[in-house]
From Swiss-Prot:
GO terms for biological process: pantothenate biosynthetic process. This is 3-methyl-2-oxobutanoate hydroxymethyltransferase. Mg(2+) binds at residues 50, 89, 121. It catalyses: 3-methyl-2-oxobutanoate + (6R)-5,10-methylene-5,6,7,8-tetrahydrofolate + H2O = 2-dehydropantoate + (6S)-5,6,7,8-tetrahydrofolate. It is found in: Cytoplasm. Transmembrane segments: none annotated. One of its GO terms (cellular component) is cytoplasm. Keywords: Cytoplasm, Magnesium, Metal-binding, Pantothenate biosynthesis, Transferase. 3-methyl-2-oxobutanoate binds at residues 50-51, 89, 119. Pathway: Cofactor biosynthesis; (R)-pantothenate biosynthesis; (R)-pantoate from 3-methyl-2-oxobutanoate: step 1/2. It holds the Pfam family Pantoate_transf. Binds 1 Mg(2+) ion per subunit.
Amino acid sequence: MSQVVQSRRLRAIDIGKRKAEGRKIIALTAYHAHTAGIVDPYCDFILVGDSLGMVMHGMESTIPVTLEMMILQAQAVIRGTEKALVVVDMPFGSYEASREQAFLNASRVLKETGAGAIKMEGGAHFAETVAFLVQRGVPVMGHIGLTPQAVNTMGGFKVQGRGPDDERRLLEDARAISEAGAFAIVLEGIVEPVARAIASSPRVTAATIGIGASAVCDGQILVLEDMLGLSERTPKFVRQFGSLRTHIEDAVKAYADEVRAGRFPADDHTYG
C-alpha cells in the first residue's frame, strides 16, 4: 500500500533545524502573489519586508510604511505560496512603545495573514519584547546592524561593526536577541569579522541571515527586485542574478512599436 506524503509549509523551527544540520538557509523578499509563487519552491523563508515602501511605493525610507500595508501584502504572499515560511516585518511604530503593543500588533499580523513569524528591528534593548512575544506563541526573527527604521538616528545607511565599541555592541545585541528566544537574526551591513564573531558565538543559537554581512552567516537574503536587476541603484552587497529591467524595457518598447504600426492586435489575438 502506497503511503501519501503530506507536504506542509515550513515553520520557524525548521529554520533552526537547517542551521543545526549545516544547511544554508535561502531567503528572498516578496510582496505579490505571483512573484512569491515563483520564488516559493527555492526559498526556506520569504520575507514580506517593509522595504515594500521603497520598492513598491517609491518612498524614501521604510518609516512611512503602515501595519495595514504589511498585512495586505502578506495576505497576497500567503495566497501565492505553499512551501516557504512567510515572515512579516513589523513596521516602524508598531512595536516600540511597549511589549503589550508589540504583542497586540504581532498577533494581529499572524491572525489576519496566516504568516508563520514576524521580524522586528533592534538590539539588546528589545530583548525583553522578543521574550514577551515568544512566550506568548509569536515566533520572532530579529534584525541588527544596519536597521533601516533607525536611518534617521543612524545618520544614513552606514556599514556597521567598524571599531571595537561597535563590535561589542553588535555581539551583545545578537546574544541578547538569541537568548530571548528569536529563531533567527538578520545581520545587515556588518563587516565580515564581526559577522563571523556573531555567527560562531556559542551564545548565538539563532540562525544568522546575512544581507551585506558576508558568506559566514547561516543563510542569505536579498531584496528580490535588487537581485533580479529591476532596481535602478543597488548596494555593494547585491549581486544581480538577472537583468529584468532591460528585458522589461525591451518588451514594452516592442509592444508600443507594434501598436503604433497597427500590427497588434493581429488576427491571432482577435475574436471572430
